């Protein structure tokens, strides 16, 4: 299998990839063990990505000799070897390769796939495709024996993020929007919450995530994610309202974090996780017209733009989804 050994890593230059790898390892250290290769259902085969943490899940979909692959891990040589040996042992050929989004831990294996299977060069699909790739449109259908896959555009984690609905199983391949365990990083919180509602409305029972175990109750998981994001919005608004009541006109992000989480968290958690997340919440609230900012000493200071009770209530869609979960 040595001739199948490859390796490629697409790196976002704004990201400290070493720190992110360490973060993934720490976050996933106590998660359930996932087999390198597992036939989850007669239609769904999962191959583990061999990248940091528990890895990125690659899915091979269908029941015949030609099947569809979703995501390609991060380009680790071990992944390429595992894919080649698995497909060979099962007499499987790939007809399409679908990428949920551009992040390197999902697209990094593409060069190895093309090297091993040159016929796939014109069969790599992604929303906002790179050169040589094919576009994916919202609602586009892909078919192989035993599987009908419908693509939906659900941005937020990234602008190009797609999920894929496996119609025969009433299941969704959720990419990074909904994880098997934990919660996802978000590029645009407003778009992300709109996308979660769109995902919820597809009425899929099962979720195959790009990271972690299978999600057995996808509507509940989505509802909890929406509720958690809304609660953070409410906490931010309440923190800004409290500061105004104490004659403090505006707060820096670090002060908003302190009001919500206290002062006891370690500095890496504060600066690498909490402050970026609260910054995203504030930017969404600004887009909603609920907060504003002023510049002081060259830095943004945030304040509540309105003091209406309805701003502290969950949106109707979230209330309905949470109520459905309770019932």
Question: Regions from the language model: what does each represent?
Answer:
Residues 43, 83, 211, 236, ...:
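Residue-level signal for inorganic ion chemistry
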Residues 2-21, 26, 241-327:
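C-terminal regulatory/interaction regions
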Residues 14-18, 129-132, 157:
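Glycine/proline-rich low-complexity segments that form flexible loops, beta-turns, and polyproline
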Residues 6-7, 51-55, 67, 73-148, ...:
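Active-site HxH/HxHxD metal-binding segment of metal-dependent hydrolases
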Residues 100-106, 157, 211, 281:
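Histidine-centered divalent metal-coordination motifs
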Residues 30-90, 163-177:
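Conserved beta-strand hairpin/beta-sheet module of binuclear metal-dependent hydrolase folds
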């Amino acid at each position: 299998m040595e001739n199948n050994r490859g390796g490629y890593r697409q790196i976002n230059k704004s990201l400290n990839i070493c720190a992110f790898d360490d973060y993934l390892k720490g976050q996933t250290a106590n998660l359930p063990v996932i087999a390198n290769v597992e036939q989850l259902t007669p239609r769904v085969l999962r191959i583990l990505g061999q990248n940091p943490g528990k890895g990125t899940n690659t899915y091979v979909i269908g029941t015949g000799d030609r099947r569809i692959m979703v995501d390609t891990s991060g380009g680790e040589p071990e992944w390429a070897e595992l894919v080649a040996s698995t497909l060979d042992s099962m007499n499987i050929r790939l007809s399409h390769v679908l990428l949920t989004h551009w992040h390197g831990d999902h697209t990094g294996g593409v060069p190895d796939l093309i090297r091993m299977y040159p016929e796939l060069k014109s069969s790599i699909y992604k929303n906002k495709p790179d050169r040589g790739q094919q576009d994916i449109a919202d609602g586009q259908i892909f078919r192989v024996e035993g599987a009908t896959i419908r693509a939906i555009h659900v941005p937020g984690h990234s602008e190009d993020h797609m999920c894929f609905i496996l119609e025969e199983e009433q299941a969704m391949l959720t990419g990074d929007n909904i994880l098997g365990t934990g919660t996802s990083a978000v590029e645009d919180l407003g778009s992300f919450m709109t996308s979660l509602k769109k995902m919820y409305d597809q009425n899929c029972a099962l979720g195959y995530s790009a990271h972690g175990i299978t999600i057995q109750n996808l509507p509940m998981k989505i509802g909890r994610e929406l509720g958690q994001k809304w609660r953070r919005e409410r906490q931010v608004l309440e923190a800004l309202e409290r500061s105004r009541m104490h004659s403090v006109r505006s707060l820096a992000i670090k002060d908003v974090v302190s009001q919500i989480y206290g002062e006891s968290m370690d500095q890496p958690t504060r600066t690498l996780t909490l402050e970026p997340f609260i910054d995203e919440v504030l930017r969404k609230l600004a887009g909603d017209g609920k907060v504003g900012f002023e510049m002081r000493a060259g830095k943004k200071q945030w304040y509540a733009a309105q003091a209406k009770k309805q701003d502290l209530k969950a949106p109707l869609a979230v209330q309905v989804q949470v109520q459905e979960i309770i019932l």
